Amino acid sequence: MSQPELRDNRRVILDGQPQVRFRAAGQLFDRIPLANLSHGGCLAIIPFQEAGALCLDTPVTELVIFHPGMTANPITARVAWTIAHAEGDQVAVGLQFNDMAHDTRIALVAVVDSAILESAKR
């Protein structure tokens, strides 16, 4: 049996190689691949050996998304969840956005909505 969808926002997979940079738990995570993005958060894929300090509700600062159309203004967020299937695997880290500048919000909505429209055409 599958779990009901609890997320509030539709996730999209972006073209290209979107990445994110952020600080959390006293560490800088730089050029981390993004698996998906939404109006409310993103899914980062972090090497197991680097992700150990990230647990539920860890504050995230200075988050910047590297993708055409996004601004370089930092976003604050929190770790919403993490999952790794086995030691040594990469860790999927769900980040929930808390606060961002108005122009960053506008850019984020435009990027996500554009990806949704493109996927609907396929």
For each predicted feature, which ranges?
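Short beta-strand-centered aromatic/proline hotspots
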Residues: 31-33, 75-81
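Hydrophobic core residues within well-ordered beta-strands of beta-rich domains
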Residues: 14, 73-75, 91
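Short, solvent-exposed secondary-structure boundary/capping segments
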Residues: 42-46, 83-97
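Short conserved beta-strand and strand-loop elements enriched in small hydrophobics
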Residues: 17-23, 56-72
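N-terminal helix initiation/capping motif
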Residues: 1-48, 109-122
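Short, conserved charged micro-motifs
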Residues: 51-55, 106
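Short glycine/serine/proline-enriched coil/turn segments at secondary-structure junctions
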Residues: 26, 53-54, 70-71, 85-87
